[in-house]
Amino acid sequence: KECMTDGTVCYIHNHNDCCGSCLCSNGPIARPWEMMVGNCMCGPKA
């Protein structure tokens, strides 16, 4: 299965498809909300 390259927006339903990690700017507490609204991007493995 192909993974999503760095810089691809990742959401709750596909955040595990990033080649690296799904990175969100405002830390873990806001993460589910940020993933829902599309504020997270695939980036290097954390």
UniProtKB/Swiss-Prot annotation:
Question: Could you tell me which residues belong to the region Keys region for toxin activity?
Answer: 31-33
- Pull one GO CC term from this UniProt entry: extracellular region
Which terms does the record give in the GO molecular function aspect? sodium channel regulator activity; toxin activity
Any coiled-coil regions, as ranges:
none
Subcellular location per UniProt equals: Secreted
Uses, biotech or industry? Could be considered as a biological insecticide candidate, when fused to Galanthus nivalis agglutinin (GNA), a protein with the potential to cross the insect gut. This chimeric Sf1a/GNA variant shows a gain in toxicity against insects when administered orally, while maintaining similar effects as the wild-type toxin when injected. This variant has been found to be orally toxic against larvae of the tomato moth (Laconobia oleracea), the rice brown planthopper (Nilaparvata lugens), and the peach-potato aphid (Myzus persicae).
Gene3D superfamilies, from UniProt? Answer: 4.10.40.60
Q: Which Pfam families has this protein been placed in?
A: Toxin_28 (PF08115)
Tissues showing expression? Expressed by the venom gland.
Keywords attached to this Swiss-Prot or TrEMBL record, sorted alphabetically, are: Disulfide bond, Ion channel impairing toxin, Knottin, Neurotoxin, Secreted, Toxin, Voltage-gated sodium channel impairing toxin
Keyword Disulfide bond among UniProt keywords: yes
Q: Which domain of life is it from?
A: Eukaryota
Q: Which cysteines are joined by disulfide bonds?
A: 3-19, 10-22, 18-42, 24-40
Belongs to which family? Belongs to the neurotoxin 16 (SFI) family.
Additional free-text comment from the UniProt record: Negative results: does not show significant effects on voltage-gated calcium channel (Cav) and voltage-gated potassium channel (Kv) currents in cockroach DUM neurons. In vivo, does not induce any toxic effects when injected intravenously into adult mice at a dose of 1.5 mg/kg body weight.
Role of this protein? Insecticidal toxin. It inhibits insect voltage-gated sodium channels (Nav) by partially blocking the channel pore (1 uM inhibits 55.7% sodium current in DUM neurons from the American cockroach), not by acting as a gating modifier. The inhibition is only partially reversible (about 25% recovery) after prolonged washout. In vivo, the toxin causes flaccid paralysis followed by death when injected into Heliothis virescens larvae. It also causes uncoordinated movements followed by full paralysis to sheep blowflies (Lucilia cuprina).
User: What free text does the record give on domains?
Assistant: The presence of a 'disulfide through disulfide knot' structurally defines this protein as a knottin.
- Name the record gives this protein: Mu-segestritoxin-Sf1a
Which species expresses this protein natively? Answer: Segestria florentina
Identify the taxonomic lineage of the organism of origin: Eukaryota, Metazoa, Ecdysozoa, Arthropoda, Chelicerata
